[in-house]
């Protein structure tokens, strides 16, 4: 049995220039995940369920657990001194870590502390998403938004933690995707899936079909394609949608499938955040042999203009994403007007 800590150190030894800072940073995320795991499991017994009564910069109600997870992860990252600052879905602006080693720290972290938190009240899987970049600004100076507004191709590492029937941490540093399952009796994450790859073909599609009337024509056509009978392509595909990006992505990664959150009439730019959700998941998907686009463009190539920028998102088994892109190209939005 190999633990997450042992695995990370082992991989670090493969690079003679490695300084151990990224290892320490990932260890901080691991600690934050353990704390969130512990408190999610007793969420119904203490007063951390439901809405907090405040809204984020996007005008969305923040759940108590959103804020709790944000504070715990922020504290864990700040304590290690390997991070110059963070950007979070739950923060209006970047958070600069002052003092200690922070000003000379090499990395910045972007995160969605608790994805799918609206599901927690009914005991449905939720998750944490993180993305790590090297800072652009000079060491010894305060970081700026410039350090965070980098395309996804610049990511050093990315991953997520899914809190479900078991808690699992999945990450990549650009050398494959690896998954670790938490053993609460030992307090450690143990390697359970090494070099995870998407199956060559998929048979699941994940999309909120309740918004069908608002979808672009190409997406509507693709959904109908998924539902049609065709033995050669093993259709109809199975529809599976949890409403938690981490949970839907994780299932499709292991089983084969596509996750879609397109632009809609009410959210023409898409709803998912490019920096906190799309980029890290796209990095993981590509490292696992999958594909991630906004329906036309590769997600990782998009140069962000603002912290809370949104994007349409198509991610999963490569052939399924390419099929969806084909329908979008064949039936452009103009035909739906």
From Swiss-Prot:
<comment type="pathway">
    <text>Carbohydrate biosynthesis; gluconeogenesis.</text>
</comment>
<dbReference type="GO" id="GO:0000287">
    <property type="term" value="F:magnesium ion binding"/>
</dbReference>
<dbReference type="InterPro" id="IPR028343">
    <property type="entry name" value="FBPtase"/>
</dbReference>
<feature type="binding site">
    <location>
        <begin position="115"/>
        <end position="118"/>
    </location>
    <ligand>
        <name>substrate</name>
    </ligand>
</feature>
<comment type="similarity">
    <text>Belongs to the FBPase class 1 family.</text>
</comment>
<dbReference type="GO" id="GO:0042132">
    <property type="term" value="F:fructose 1,6-bisphosphate 1-phosphatase activity"/>
</dbReference>
<dbReference type="GO" id="GO:0005986">
    <property type="term" value="P:sucrose biosynthetic process"/>
</dbReference>
<dbReference type="InterPro" id="IPR033391">
    <property type="entry name" value="FBPase_N"/>
</dbReference>
<keyword id="KW-0460">Magnesium</keyword>
<dbReference type="InterPro" id="IPR044015">
    <property type="entry name" value="FBPase_C_dom"/>
</dbReference>
<keyword id="KW-0378">Hydrolase</keyword>
<keyword id="KW-0479">Metal-binding</keyword>
<dbReference type="GO" id="GO:0030388">
    <property type="term" value="P:fructose 1,6-bisphosphate metabolic process"/>
</dbReference>
<keyword id="KW-0119">Carbohydrate metabolism</keyword>
<feature type="binding site">
    <location>
        <position position="115"/>
    </location>
    <ligand>
        <name>Mg(2+) 2</name>
    </ligand>
</feature>
<feature type="binding site">
    <location>
        <position position="114"/>
    </location>
    <ligand>
        <name>Mg(2+) 1</name>
    </ligand>
</feature>
<feature type="binding site">
    <location>
        <position position="89"/>
    </location>
    <ligand>
        <name>Mg(2+) 1</name>
    </ligand>
</feature>
<feature type="binding site">
    <location>
        <position position="271"/>
    </location>
    <ligand>
        <name>substrate</name>
    </ligand>
</feature>
<keyword id="KW-0963">Cytoplasm</keyword>
<protein>
    <recommendedName>
        <fullName>Fructose-1,6-bisphosphatase class 1</fullName>
        <ecNumber>3.1.3.11</ecNumber>
    </recommendedName>
</protein>
<dbReference type="GO" id="GO:0006002">
    <property type="term" value="P:fructose 6-phosphate metabolic process"/>
</dbReference>
<dbReference type="GO" id="GO:0006000">
    <property type="term" value="P:fructose metabolic process"/>
</dbReference>
<feature type="binding site">
    <location>
        <position position="112"/>
    </location>
    <ligand>
        <name>Mg(2+) 1</name>
    </ligand>
</feature>
<dbReference type="InterPro" id="IPR020548">
    <property type="entry name" value="Fructose_bisphosphatase_AS"/>
</dbReference>
<feature type="binding site">
    <location>
        <position position="241"/>
    </location>
    <ligand>
        <name>substrate</name>
    </ligand>
</feature>
<dbReference type="GO" id="GO:0005829">
    <property type="term" value="C:cytosol"/>
</dbReference>
<feature type="binding site">
    <location>
        <position position="112"/>
    </location>
    <ligand>
        <name>Mg(2+) 2</name>
    </ligand>
</feature>
<comment type="subunit">
    <text>Homotetramer.</text>
</comment>
<dbReference type="Pfam" id="PF00316">
    <property type="entry name" value="FBPase"/>
</dbReference>
<feature type="binding site">
    <location>
        <position position="208"/>
    </location>
    <ligand>
        <name>substrate</name>
    </ligand>
</feature>
<dbReference type="Pfam" id="PF18913">
    <property type="entry name" value="FBPase_C"/>
</dbReference>
<dbReference type="InterPro" id="IPR000146">
    <property type="entry name" value="FBPase_class-1"/>
</dbReference>
<feature type="binding site">
    <location>
        <position position="277"/>
    </location>
    <ligand>
        <name>Mg(2+) 2</name>
    </ligand>
</feature>
<dbReference type="GO" id="GO:0006094">
    <property type="term" value="P:gluconeogenesis"/>
</dbReference>
């Amino acid at each position: 049995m190999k633990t997450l800590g042992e695995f990370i150190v082992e991989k670090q030894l493969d690079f003679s220039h490695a300084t151990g800072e990224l290892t320490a940073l990932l260890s901080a995320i691991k600690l934050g995940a353990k704390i969130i795991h512990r408190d999610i499991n007793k969420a119904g017994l203490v007063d951390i369920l439901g809405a907090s009564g405040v809204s984020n910069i996007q005008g969305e109600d923040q759940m108590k657990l959103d804020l709790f997870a944000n504070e715990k992860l922020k504290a864990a990252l700040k304590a290690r001194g390997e991070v110059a600052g963070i950007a979070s879905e739950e923060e209006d602006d970047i958070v600069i870590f002052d003092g200690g080693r922070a000003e000379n720290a090499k990395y910045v972290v972007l995160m969605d502390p608790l994805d799918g938190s609206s599901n927690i009240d009914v005991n449905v899987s939720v998750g944490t998403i993180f993305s790590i970049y090297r800072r652009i600004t000079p060491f010894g100076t305060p970081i700026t938004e410039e350090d965070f507004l980098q395309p996804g191709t610049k990511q050093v590492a990315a991953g997520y933690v899914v809190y479900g029937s078991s808690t699992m941490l999945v990450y990549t540093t650009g050398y494959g995707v690896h998954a670790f399952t938490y053993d609460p009796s030992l307090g450690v994450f143990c390697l359970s899936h090494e070099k995870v790859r998407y199956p060559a073909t998929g048979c699941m599609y994940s999309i909120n079909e309740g918004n069908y009337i608002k979808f672009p024509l190409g997406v509507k056509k693709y959904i109908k394609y998924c539902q049609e009978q065709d033995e050669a392509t093993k259709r109809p595909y199975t529809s599976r949608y949890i409403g938690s990006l981490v949970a839907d992505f994780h299932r499709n990664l292991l089983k084969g499938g596509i996750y879609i959150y397109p632009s809609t009439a009410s959210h023409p730019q898409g709803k998912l955040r490019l920096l906190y959700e799309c980029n890290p998941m796209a990095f993981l998907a590509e490292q696992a042999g999958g594909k991630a686009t906004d329906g036309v463009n590769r997600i990782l190539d998009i140069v962000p203009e603002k912290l809370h920028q949104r994007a349409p998102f198509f991610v999963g088994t490569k052939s399924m994403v390419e099929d969806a892109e084909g329908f979008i190209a064949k039936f452009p939005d103009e035909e739906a007007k």
